């Protein structure tokens, strides 16, 4: 769930907010510096179509964000659900390593909808997007995110990446459309600007386009409308890749195409249980055990898999490479934060993860031609965030403990 786009909220969600603006398929975890990702923002709605989320506690511009019932909010490893009270829609979500799934339960309505903000990005905006309607149930495309669109460090973090998607709906696309906002070239499109009233007004006035099957633009949105009966459910599955559209489609086919929401949720629970069972504890209260395993869960979110199911990944030279069986390319290494806490723990409970990350940093230094380890890596960016060279401590610790599945001489 996402509650905010601008400001300084790296995860895109804050418990203090009273409204939700959508559900994204990429997300950062527990960071500052204005955040990033939060791409492919999906929102189920009913009634009038709004093209912007609007602003919480600001009625000067209307949007599709919705209040939600805190009492219905459930969050577990691999599962989240909530009731959107403005639309009386229950939303449930789960995921596989490369894909996500949303399960919506609608009220009775002649104008139910799923809408997607393709430009959305935590801390800024995607600067260009592409979408194509593939068939009666499927869309695919990409979202290009550059420093000009803010994001990590409001652009100073130099995050430059493209998210590719392949999405299928359980209801046919019989009544769909796009919107495309004409953003002037001289407009700044960063953290504060993209949530300003002039910018939101510009997007809200974008015309609806219904006579096309594919579109490229600076600020695109997509929607599909359909009638629903009380309690009717609609599912949406999405494959994500940072390599190319073929990678997103292949990730989709390999991981989620043949599965329903219940299967994905069950497999996600089993996968997290397997990981969390790396450490077993005794004694303590139930609350203390919950705190322990919640903290442990957070240590396992990053560095995350950056390699497609076929082994391909975008390297430090921004070209496509293929990893061999010795490592899985990973991303999001917040060195300053983790070199003396998370990574010493991982050397004990998950040495393969440490090996993957060291190989990822080594290949990135080699492919980029920089020949040094980045201290805060995000999607191949040498962001320069924080101080020192914490990766050296991670490397030394791993080497001493016998984790040497990398080119030590290099």
Q: What is the meaning of each model-derived region?
A:
Residues 1-410:
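Accessory carbohydrate-recognition regions in carbohydrate-active enzymes
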């Amino acid at each position: 769930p996402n509650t905010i786009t601008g400001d300084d909220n790296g995860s895109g969600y804050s418990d203090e907010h009273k409204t939700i603006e959508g559900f994204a398929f990429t997300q950062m975890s527990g960071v500052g510096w204005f955040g990033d990702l939060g791409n492919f923002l999906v929102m189920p709605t009913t009634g009038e179509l709004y093209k912007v989320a609007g602003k919480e506690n600001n009625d000067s511009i209307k949007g599709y964000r919705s209040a939600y019932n805190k009492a219905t909010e459930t969050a577990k490893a691999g599962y989240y659900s909530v009731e959107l009270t403005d639309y009386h829609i229950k939303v449930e979500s789960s995921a596989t390593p490369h894909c996500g799934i949303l399960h919506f339960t609608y009220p009775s309505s002649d104008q139910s909808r799923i809408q997607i903000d393709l430009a959305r990005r935590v801390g800024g905006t995607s600067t260009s997007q592409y979408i194509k309607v593939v068939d009666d149930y499927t869309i695919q495309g990409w979202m290009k995110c550059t420093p000009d669109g803010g994001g990590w460090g409001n652009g100073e973090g130099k995050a430059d990446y493209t998210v590719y998607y392949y999405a299928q709906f359980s209801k046919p696309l019989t009544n769909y459309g796009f919107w495309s906002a004409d953003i002037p070239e001289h407009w700044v499109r960063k953290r504060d600007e993209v949530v300003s009233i002039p910018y939101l007004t510009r997007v809200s006035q974008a015309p609806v386009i219904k006579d096309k099957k594919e579109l490229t633009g600076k600020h695109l949105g997509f929607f599909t409308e359909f009638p629903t009966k009380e309690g009717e459910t609609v599912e949406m599955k999405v494959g994500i890749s940072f390599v190319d559209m073929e990678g997103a489609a292949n990730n989709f086919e390999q991981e989620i195409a043949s599965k329903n929401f219940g299967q994905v949720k069950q497999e996600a629970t089993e996968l997290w249980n397997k990981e969390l069972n790396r450490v077993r504890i005794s004694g303590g209260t139930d609350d203390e055990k919950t705190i322990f395993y919640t903290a442990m869960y957070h240590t396992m979110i990053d560095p995350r898999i950056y390699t497609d199911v076929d082994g391909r990944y975008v390297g430090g030279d921004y070209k496509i490479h293929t990893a061999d069986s010795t490592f899985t390319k990973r991303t999001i290494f917040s060195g300053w934060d983790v070199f003396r806490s998370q990574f010493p723990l991982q050397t004990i409970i998950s040495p393969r993860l440490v090996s993957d990350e060291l190989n990822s940093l080594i290949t990135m230094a080699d492919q980029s031609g920089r020949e040094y380890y980045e201290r805060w890596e995000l999607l191949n960016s040498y962001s320069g965030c924080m101080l020192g060279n914490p990766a050296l401590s991670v490397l030394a610790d791993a080497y001493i403990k016998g984790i040497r599945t990398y080119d030590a001489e290099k």
